[in-house]
Amino acid sequence: MNMDILQRQDKGIFDAITAEVRRQTETLELIASENFASRAVMEACGSVMTNKYAEGYPGKRYYGGCEFVDIAENLARDRAKKLFGCDYVNVQPHSGSSANMGVLFAVLKPGDRIMGLDLSHGGHLTHGSKVNFSGQLFEAHSYGVDRETGCIDMNKVEEMALEVRPKLIICGASAYSQGFDFKAFRDVADKVGAFLMADIAHPAGLIAAGLLNDPMPHCHFVTTTTHKTLRGPRGGMIMMGKDFENPLGITVKTKKGSRTKMMSEVIDAEIMPGIQGGPLMHIIAAKGVAFGEALQPEFKDYAVQVRNNAAVMAERFSGLDYQIVSGGTKNHLMLIDLRNKNVTGKVAENLLHDAGITVNKNMVPFDDKSPFVTSGIRIGTPAMTTRGMQESHAENIVGFIDRVISAADSEGIEKVCAEVRSDVKAMCKDLPLNDFGPE
């Protein structure tokens, strides 16, 4: 990507970007929520569509001159519908959090009750955390995982729902390595008259590839990010398998009186003008590019390899006496409890960073340490699989990580990190980014 003009005009930003290019090229990216977007996606992100205001929706804009951004947004919507097999898509949310906010604001009033997976058990801030709008504006109740199995117990979810009687149940996670039984969640939601929202931000690419349970037949709403396993630009999206008349009593005036608004109309209005103004048309164009890529047969091959690599890593870690929360993985990530290794997540993250391996510290279920220290790390395979990682590489990477963590308290840790970093650089040369990530 040519940056001659930027180099001449703003050396500070140019130097920061150049350093980030070097970091992405020469280190192993194992943060589960990160990936490498294609050059085509990045070109769309940097296109002239960043200059265009387009409040509203295709064919119903508040600004003139939107005929070409309309084409881009319609392509993005149509491709997303085909990719996920759904009737309704809104590609305008700026982020996954914006998408979740749009749904919550559309169907809830302040003080309404919601249920979501506890943040410390693998959930997300927007699923009811007290430091987030979802836990401040609404009465949030959190379900967790079983202490013994590390998995969600649907019997306990049902018990809580029957006691709490929430208006919305959220099923989804940011650090949970098992799949979700969306049908079972819908059965619970129906028993208490609740809406059901699936947040598939993490496994969206695997779901699109048909490798995990499909939420569309069971959930009223499905939200996602467009990066992570979808390998697109940073952004959000809201979907519905089938549109339906809203049961909230929201109507619209017509020439003959009034009619009940479809739920799609309610969601659209909540995104714009409810919580956003002008959409990011350059990002929406890039979303369309990414969805087009995900519709190609090669994307399923990629998704299969993502899951295979994760399974191999989890098995190898277990063989080295690392505790994988829930006992293994069925998706792209794993959460490792390091308490039996006497290393905190913070220490592990920092030491691995010194060795050229990027992970994130993460709380584990029933953690006794703060979110700034944690007892675990989260590891994912999407980014390295984009670079061409196969099972043999995955096994070697586990070996790199084990060498560092095993020496964490030793006097020779600096030497170990330096040796691993040398091995990491060699692997990175064998796994070039090619058409993905920085040049």
From Swiss-Prot:
Q: What does this protein do?
A: Catalyzes the reversible interconversion of serine and glycine with tetrahydrofolate (THF) serving as the one-carbon carrier. This reaction serves as the major source of one-carbon groups required for the biosynthesis of purines, thymidylate, methionine, and other important biomolecules. Also exhibits THF-independent aldolase activity toward beta-hydroxyamino acids, producing glycine and aldehydes, via a retro-aldol mechanism.
- Positions bearing the site annotation: Plays an important role in substrate specificity: H227
Indicate the secretion signal residues: none
Q: In which pathway does it act?
A: One-carbon metabolism; tetrahydrofolate interconversion; Amino-acid biosynthesis; glycine biosynthesis; glycine from L-serine: step 1/1
Recorded protein name is Serine hydroxymethyltransferase
EC numbers on record:
2.1.2.1
Entry-linked Gene3D superfamilies: Aspartate Aminotransferase, domain 1, Type I PLP-dependent aspartate aminotransferase-like (Major domain)
Q: Which family does it belong to?
A: Belongs to the SHMT family.
Q: Name one Pfam family in it.
A: SHMT
Q: Does the keyword ATP-binding apply?
A: no
Q: Which residues carry this modification: N6-(pyridoxal phosphate)lysine?
A: K228
**Listed cofactors:** pyridoxal 5'-phosphate
Q: Which organism is it from?
A: Chlorobium phaeobacteroides (strain BS1)
UniProt feature coiled coil, ranges:
none
Taking the first listed entry, what is the main subcellular location of this protein, grouped into a coarse class? cytoplasm
Q: Which reaction does it catalyse?
A: (6R)-5,10-methylene-5,6,7,8-tetrahydrofolate + glycine + H2O = (6S)-5,6,7,8-tetrahydrofolate + L-serine
- Specify the enzyme's EC class, one word: transferase
GO terms for MF:
glycine hydroxymethyltransferase activity; pyridoxal phosphate binding
Q: Where does (6S)-5,6,7,8-tetrahydrofolate bind?
A: L119, G123, H124, L125, S370, P371, F372
PANTHER family per the UniProt record, alphabetical = SERINE HYDROXYMETHYLTRANSFERASE, SERINE HYDROXYMETHYLTRANSFERASE 1
| InterPro entries with a match to the protein in the record | PyrdxlP-dep_Trfase (IPR015424), PyrdxlP-dep_Trfase_major (IPR015421), PyrdxlP-dep_Trfase_small (IPR015422), Ser_HO-MeTrfase (IPR001085), Ser_HO-MeTrfase-like (IPR049943), Ser_HO-MeTrfase_PLP_BS (IPR019798), SHMT-like_dom (IPR039429)
- Can you quote a single GO CC term? cytosol
Which compartments is it annotated to reside in? Answer: Cytoplasm
> How does this protein assemble?
Homodimer.
Single Gene Ontology BP annotation: tetrahydrofolate interconversion
